[in-house]
Amino acid sequence: MEPIKNLPRLCRTLGYEFTQIELLTQALTHRSAANKHNERLEFLGDSILSIVISDALYHQFPKATEGDLSRMRATLVRGDTLTIIAQEFKLGDYLYLGPGELKSGGFRRESILADAVEAIIGAIYLDSDLEVCRKLLLTWYAERLAEIQPGVSQKDAKTLLQEYLQGLKKPLPDYQVINIEGDAHDQTFTVECRIEDLSQSVIGVASSRRKAEQIAAAQVLELLKK
């Protein structure tokens, strides 16, 4: 397995220094690249993320129903949320992919990015313990936990952005597909989202146009709320 460059920089971004750096390397390794890949770490990280977020929501909302807690958790741990976190960490710059995945733009594919976040969580757990993972994840999720509320429909990002702009009597966002890569059965869509109040355009990349639009919309919402 080839060494992945700039791991110390990624550790600083994550807010965690690995004792066993090979665990981070494995977490960033897609199954297309090597036999020792990140799928088992992903399995572990998925469970850890679920228990940490469940515990946080349980204590943050003592009067919330089981249904509300489940819906809020689903919003926080679903793939598009993890993809946005991966993009915030610029994980695509560090992934180790096989030649086929690399050529088809796998470093931008939302499922690969989301899986890598879960694998990193699993790697951090093995390198430390559950309490360290809990504190780190609560840091990663601080803004999202502060914003989420029970009883509120967990609407998708495009709907939330549209309602936000309508409330301000602003023009609706404009979504444009600016690139499509890959074969017909395995395409990667790059979508640009533009709104009046942002001078820059925001890009979403995913395996479908709809998902790419959702990712771009979620990033625009975060920029508007800063």
From Swiss-Prot:
One of its GO terms (molecular function) is ribonuclease III activity. Its cofactor is Mg(2+). It comes from Shewanella sp. (strain W3-18-1). This is Ribonuclease 3. Digests double-stranded RNA. Involved in the processing of primary rRNA transcript to yield the immediate precursors to the large and small rRNAs (23S and 16S). Processes some mRNAs, and tRNAs when they are encoded in the rRNA operon. Processes pre-crRNA and tracrRNA of type II CRISPR loci if present in the organism. PANTHER family: RIBONUCLEASE 3, RIBONUCLEASE III. Homodimer. One of its GO terms (cellular component) is cytoplasm.
